[in-house]
Amino acid sequence: MNKQLLIASALLSANLTHAADFELSGYVGLEWREHFEEGQFNNANNEQADRQLGLTAEPEMVWSLADGEQTIVFKPYVRIDSADDERTHGDIRELSWMTYGDDWEVTAGISKVYWGVAESQHLVDIINQTDFVEAPDGEDKLGQPMVKLSFIRDWGTVTGFVLPGFRERTFPGDEGRFRTELSMDIDNAQYQAGEEDAHVDYALRWNHTIDDYDVGFSWFNGTSRDPIFAPARTSGELVPFYAQINQLGIDLQATLDSWLWKFEAIYRTYDDSVKNDFDQLGTLTQRDFGVENYTAATGGFEYTFYGPFETNWDWGVLAEYQYDSRENGSIAIGQNDVFLGSRIAFNDAASSEVLAGISQDLD
């Protein structure tokens, strides 16, 4: 287990000795993945699975202390996969203590934070690392050690983050699907920061609702959650490299009757030393690593038909456009792409819904 997670666990354990209201919820799930074509990267040593069976569990325990003025949340997660050893893993999604006053709120421990409004990609959502072995869509996140302080004012909410410790991205193993052609050397990840995964990151966000409009501005400084992949000199594997970045973000959503108009964008910068190093490496390997300052944006709409055909469910149609200023489309996912999708919300107690979509490169 990550050493930052152990420290956060120890800090919270003492609070549980006091009398508290307790609530237990969560889920246990079975998953069946069937791949109708052989793995693209099968070889004499490894064969990608055509079928994957999985068991998942994510219980959530909530303790309410001091007449509800303090809350402790513990949410572990575990997955067992029949084919991919890297996908068999566990994580502490949340282990946090929260308290609040009239116009402020503090959270300390391991937690998850979501920023953004778009469906097809999440540009501004940078606090938590992606749990990529779960799914390639970036929806699943690892727990992040943090101290979060929010101030609530009439003109908006300002939230500051101190993020002590970094979580490396998870990747499928050689037998898994949605993997790269070259194997991933996750045991020897490289960092720009001398502190490596002990580097302390910082973030700041302001968000506010003005009539029918939700707006947010964010700033992040620290270790990028998106690794750069460089080939190892001897093994022929890919080595993740985590650079230091500054990122500015904006997200907007307008709720106008049955329409949801969505937009989010970022501007990300790297240190000149890192850009120069990867430019030189790119010259030697004839590759474009995409390490340059860039702008990316996603915008579009969702229109909802409420109760069509006299049913209790709602049907939404979505369309979004994705832009990235980097010229190399193989590096920039969503450089000049369009996303079309549909959502069915069943409006039941479990908030069940089905979301499906497809992205198309316009180049």
Question: Can you say where each PLM-predicted feature lies in the sequence?
Answer:
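Residues that define the transmembrane beta-barrel architecture of outer-membrane proteins
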Residues: 47-57, 88-93, 141-145, 152, ...
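Extracellular loop and loop/strand-boundary signature of outer-membrane beta-barrel proteins
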Residues: 42-47, 79-83, 131-135, 188-192, ...
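Outer membrane beta-barrel
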Residues: 62-178, 211
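Transmembrane beta-strands of outer-membrane beta-barrel proteins
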Residues: 22-28, 70-74, 106, 158-160, ...
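Outer-membrane beta-barrel translocator domains and adjoining extracellular loop/strand segments
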Residues: 36-45, 83-91, 120-125, 171-177, ...
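Detector for outer-membrane/organellar transmembrane beta-barrel domains
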Residues: 222, 258-275, 279-361
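Residues on the lipid-exposed face of transmembrane beta-strands in outer-membrane beta-barrel proteins
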Residues: 30, 57-63, 94-99, 147-151, ...
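Transmembrane beta-strands of outer-membrane beta-barrel pores
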Residues: 30-36, 63-67, 76-82, 101, ...
